[in-house]
Amino acid sequence: MGNQIDAVVVSTPDHNHAPISLMAMGMNKNVYCQKPLTQYVSEAREMDKVAKERNLVTQMGIQVHSFYDYVLATELIRQGIVGKVKKVIAWSPKVWGYDGPEPEGSDPVPAHLDWDLWQGNAKKRPYKEGFYHPDNWRKIVDYGNGTLGDMGVHIFDTPYNALELGVPLTIKNNCRKPNGYGHPEKNEVTYVFPGTKYTAKKLTWIWYDGEGAPKLQKDLKLPNDEKLPEQGAMFIGEKGKRLLLPHFMELPRLIVKGKYENIDIDKYDPQGKLGEPVKDYDAESNKHYHQFVDACLGKDECSAPFSYASKLTEVIVLGTIAAQFPGKKLHWDGQNGRFKEEEANRFLSV
C-alpha cells in the first residue's frame, strides 16, 4: 500500500507528531503535520534535516499563516509602518495547563481507543477519563505543549515571520513551580532575540497566557480605553507607533500618539497581490491546505515548510522548558542547540 500513498497528514497529539512524520519522510512521503511541529527541540531539528535531505514537500498546520489579515500585517511591518520594532507582546487567555496533582487509579479504556498506541513513545500511564483523550492532553507535559503549543504557535507566527527572527538568546518564564505532570495554568515568558533588519537592535518579546492574560501595561493601552482583543499581538515601534493584530480574521490596527490612524492598504499593496479581506474561516483555511496539495503536484510552494516551522516550534518549546526553571533566565546557544545552563539540556529530547 505504501507505493499508493503520496503524502501523509499527521493530526495526532503533539507527542506523536515526530515519530509518525519521521517514519513517513523515511519512506519519501510528503508530510502535512499539525502545529506545533514537535514536542522537543531535537525532534524539530531532525524533521527539518530529513525534509531537506530528501527534498520533500512539507507544511505545518498553522492555517492562519495564509489568512489575509496575517499576510497583510507581515507586509505592513516589513514596509515599516511602525518603524523599527523594539518589542512584541502576545497573549491568549486560554488555560491549557493543569496545576493539580496527577490523578490516581484508572478507568476502563473506551472500546474505540487503543490506549497503548495513543501513548506512543511517551511515558506509560493508566487511562483516566477526562484527563487525556480527546482534549486535555495539551495540558500534560508528556503529551502536549500547553497554551504555548496551542495558541502560541498561531499568535507567534506573524510577528516571528514578519520580523524574520531566528532563535532567542535568552528565555525566562515567570510561572508556578513545576509539578512534573501538568503545564502551568499561567505563563509569562520573556524572550530576547538578536536584531534583524526590521528590529531596533535586540528584540524583547513577552508572552502571556492563562486566565486574565495579558498583564495590563502602557504598551497595550488602546484608544478611548477600548478593551483589548481576547487574543492577539502588539508590535511596538521604537518611535512609539504600534500595530495591533487581533487573533484572528480582523484587520491590523495602527495606533499613533494614542489614536487609531487609518491604514491606506493601497499604499502598501498597490497591485493588490495580497488579495482581499475574507470573513469565511473555512475559505481562508483552505488556502493553506490547498497550498500543500498544489505543492505536492508541483504547482506551488508551501509557505510554512518544516525549514520555517521547526524554528518557530523551537521558540515555543524553549518557553515550555523555561517553565521548569521559574524566574530563571536561560541562555540559549542556537548554533549548537544547547543551553548554557546544563540542567536545562535534559529537556531538549525524549
Give the positions of each predicted feature.
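Beta-strand-loop-alpha-helix segment that lines the small-molecule cofactor/substrate pocket
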Residues: A18-S66, G80, G327
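Predominantly a Rossmann-like dinucleotide-binding segment in NAD(P)-dependent oxidoreductases
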Residues: V57-Q59, V64-N173, K177-Y181, V189, ...
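N-terminal Rossmann-like NAD(P) cofactor-binding module of classical short-chain dehydrogenase/reductase
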Residues: A7-V9
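Alpha-helix C-terminal capping/helix-to-coil transition sites in glycosyltransferase folds
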Residues: G2-Q4
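Conserved donor sugar-nucleotide recognition element shared by glycan-biosynthetic enzymes
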Residues: H17, S66-D69, S285, Y289
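Phosphate/diphosphate-binding loops
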Residues: L203-A213, Q217-L222, Q231-A233
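N-terminal glycine-rich "phosphate-gripper" loop used for MgATP/nucleotide binding
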Residues: T12-H15
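C-terminal helical cap and adjacent loop that interface with cofactors, partners, or active-site loops
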Residues: P126-F131, Y143-L163, P184-E188, G195, ...
